[in-house]
UniProtKB/Swiss-Prot annotation:
Signal peptide: none
Gene name in the database record: RpS13
One Pfam family of this chain: Ribosomal_S15
Family of the protein in this entry: Belongs to the universal ribosomal protein uS15 family.
Name this protein carries in UniProt: Small ribosomal subunit protein uS15
Organism per entry: Musca domestica (House fly)
GO cellular component, one term: nucleolus
Record keywords, A-Z: Ribonucleoprotein, Ribosomal protein
UniProt GO MF annotations: small ribosomal subunit rRNA binding; structural constituent of ribosome
Length: 114
């Protein structure tokens, strides 16, 4: 709870508990996963962590491409990352983690990760 209130992600909380407190798996100790505990307290993140990091990566590549317009490999990697974002979003919509009207747009992506 305390670490979640500081604004840490579930994976960061797991790393801190593993390294500082010797808790190998929170699930074995508590019976619940970190994200479930955060949900019950009301600290669930808006978008899932893996999707958040994908969007963050796409924003970084897009920023790089603004400075380096001829980077063809960068453009290709951006296409791959964005298609992965769309695939993950579709999965999370079917699992009702994301609302059905949620949509990834490159213009608003930097606001999502800021």
């Amino acid at each position: 709870k305390k670490l979640g209130k500081k604004g840490l992600t579930p994976s960061k909380i797991g790393i801190i508990l593993r390294d500082s407190h010797g808790v190998a798996q929170v699930r074995f100790v508590n019976g619940n996963k970190i994200l479930r505990i955060m949900k019950s307290v009301g600290l669930k993140p808006d978008i899932p962590e893996d999707l958040y990091h994908m969007i963050k990566k796409a924003v970084a590549i897009r920023k790089h491409l603004e400075r380096n317009r001829k980077d063809k490999d960068g453009k290709f990697r951006l296409i791959l990352v964005e298609s992965r974002i769309h695939r993950l979003a579709r999965y999370y919509k079917t699992k009702s983690v994301l609302p059905p009207n949620w949509k990834y747009e490159s213009s608003t992506a930097s606001a999502l990760v800021a």
